[in-house]
């Protein structure tokens, strides 16, 4: 896992300034850990209207992105990034993007992301060029740009040196198959609500134990499905039981 180059085929390259100019991803770009390059299919059209879409065969609402502009943009991206880059289409039909999948993508040196628009892209392009399809959830968006940015952000967090603290990525939700624990900062008391005493104790072993207990309990309450695919250790089972007892007694 090292530096990452991401090439994005998109009709709206200006949207990706959110990645290159703000936050952790911007810092990764400045540090040379991440490179994001956009390719606009409109730049590969030959008609005066720069047409990138057409009506679907068989009728129906909406328009479909044409093969040729997409293919020519992909050729340019491949020439810039190399033939080994994995081509990913962001699509509601894809597999759901998980933290485990993000870890796998972070192992790549380069990725080419296809951000579709309209009703989608010509299926023949997908069959000929796309290696993987990924979805960020069971809902429909106006285009693939936001999912592409979600993927880039998630992958960037796993690049060595991208985060300010070496443990930050490991403590994120889902990294260990669990939701994150609650977090608190100053003041110690706000509107009569106190920070849990254990976090003020300075006892790091007790703090780690409390955080794990909270992560287990929160996952059980909010995303029990995550626990079904994770084998709990004896200590983790004990902590979860303790959490549930404390909850029921409160």
Curated annotation (Swiss-Prot):
Catalyzed reactions: guanosine(37) in tRNA + S-adenosyl-L-methionine = N(1)-methylguanosine(37) in tRNA + S-adenosyl-L-homocysteine + H(+)
Example of a GO cellular component annotation carried by this entry: cytosol
InterPro entries: Alpha/beta_knot_MTases, tRNA_m1G_MeTrfase_C_sf, tRNA_m1G_MeTrfase_TrmD, tRNA_m1G_MTases_N, tRNA_MeTrfase_TRMD/TRM10
Keyword Cytoplasm among record annotations: yes
Annotated localization: Cytoplasm
A Pfam family matched in the record: tRNA_m1G_MT
One Gene Ontology MF term: tRNA (guanine(37)-N1)-methyltransferase activity
One of the protein's GO biological processes: tRNA N1-guanine methylation
Keywords, sorted A to Z: Cytoplasm, Methyltransferase, S-adenosyl-L-methionine, Transferase, tRNA processing
Listed CDD domains: TrmD-like
Binding-site positions, S-adenosyl-L-methionine: 116, 136-141
Domain of life: Bacteria
Keyword tRNA processing tagged: yes
Enzyme Commission (EC) number: 2.1.1.228
Assembly information from the UniProt record: Homodimer.
Protein's job: Specifically methylates guanosine-37 in various tRNAs.
Family label: Belongs to the RNA methyltransferase TrmD family.
The protein, known as: tRNA (guanine-N(1)-)-methyltransferase
Organism phylogeny: Bacteria, Pseudomonadati, Pseudomonadota, Gammaproteobacteria, Pseudomonadales
């Amino acid at each position: 896992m090292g530096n990452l180059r991401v090439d994005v085929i998109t009709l709206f390259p200006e949207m990706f300034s959110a990645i290159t100019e703000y936050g952790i991803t911007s810092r990764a770009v400045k540090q040379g850990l991440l490179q994001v390059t956009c390719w606009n299919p409109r730049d590969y059209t030959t008609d005066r209207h720069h047409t990138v879409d057409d009506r679907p065969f068989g009728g129906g609402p909406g328009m479909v992105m044409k093969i040729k502009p997409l293919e020519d943009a992909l050729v340019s991206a491949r020439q810039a990034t190399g033939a080994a880059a994995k081509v990913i289409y962001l699509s509601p039909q894809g597999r759901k993007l998980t933290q485990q999948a993000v870890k796998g993508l972070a192992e790549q040196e380069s990725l080419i992301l296809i951000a579709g628009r309209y009703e989608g892209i010509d299926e023949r392009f997908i069959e000929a060029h796309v290696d993987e399809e990924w979805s960020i959830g069971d809902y429909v968006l106006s285009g693939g740009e936001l999912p592409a940015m979600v993927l880039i952000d998630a992958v960037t967090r796993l690049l060595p040196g991208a985060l300010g603290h070496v443990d930050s990525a490991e403590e994120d939700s889902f990294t260990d198959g669990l939701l994150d624990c609650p977090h608190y900062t100053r003041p110690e008391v706000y509107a009569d609500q106190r920070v849990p005493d254990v976090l003020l104790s300075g006892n790091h072993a007790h703090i780690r134990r409390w955080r794990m207990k909270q992560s287990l309990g929160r996952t059980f309450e909010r995303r029990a499905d995550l626990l079904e695919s994770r084998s709990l250790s004896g200590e983790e089972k004990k902590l979860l039981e303790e959490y549930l007892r404390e909850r029921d007694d409160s």
